[in-house]
């Protein structure tokens, strides 16, 4: 069994290496879900990981296409990991409403929630997220998980399976702004590899 540990900082990546992980997924601030508490984007985080690590790592957060792959490898990663982009594929076992929400979103449509709980999550903005943020604003440091349980607990089946998009907060990366279609996984991967080869052999051939 190979273990790839998600890490959101260079220091966490080093810890994963020290306890025997085979590789790490280095997640920048752009990522959907939990980006950690350091707010370091991948243009800084990936080279930092490359400077520190001896084990291989893949880049996560903001990854969507051939440009992402080539850039990630230039910054030291062995490849890239995609979350939000893969959700918006025909093969993803989620409701069509979720896929269309990602395609219809821009890079401005995510929000960071639960920062005061030191459990920061990047989510797609919707009515439930707006309610949650109003609670955060009103309660400040007094906010507890119990105050927002209706917006975050048990909501994924309603969203991902039933397509009730305002049922609660759901993870989505800023990369939604780069997602414009819903291909099959094979089509997506084939396109990424073909376009990455073209970038390297043509656009970058003179460097």
Report each predicted region and the residues it spans.
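Conserved active-site-proximal phosphate/metal-binding subdomains
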Residues: 36-58, 63-207
């Amino acid at each position: 069994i190979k273990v790839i540990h998600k890490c959101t900082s260079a220091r966490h990546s080093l810890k994963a290496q020290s306890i025997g992980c085979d590789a790490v997924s280095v997640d920048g601030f752009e990522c959907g879900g939990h980006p950690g508490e350091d707010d370091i984007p991948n243009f800084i985080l990936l080279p930092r990981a490359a400077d520190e690590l001896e084990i291989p790592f893949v880049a996560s957060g903001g990854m969507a296409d051939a440009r992402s792959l080539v850039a990630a490898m230039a910054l030291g990663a062995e490849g890239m990991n995609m979350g939000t982009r893969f959700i918006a594929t025909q093969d993803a076992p989620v409701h069509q409403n979720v896929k269309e929400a990602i395609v219809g979103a821009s890079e401005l449509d995510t929000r960071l929630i639960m920062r005061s709980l030191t459990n920061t999550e990047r989510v797609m903005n919707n009515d439930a997220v707006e309610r949650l943020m109003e609670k955060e604003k009103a309660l400040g440091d007094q906010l507890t998980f119990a105050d927002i349980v209706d917006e975050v607990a048990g909501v994924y089946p309603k969203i991902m399976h039933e397509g009730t998009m305002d049922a609660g907060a759901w993870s989505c990366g800023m990369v939604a702004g780069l997602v414009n279609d819903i291909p099959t996984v094979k089509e997506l991967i084939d396109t990424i590899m073909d376009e990455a080869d073209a970038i390297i052999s043509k656009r970058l051939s003179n460097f």
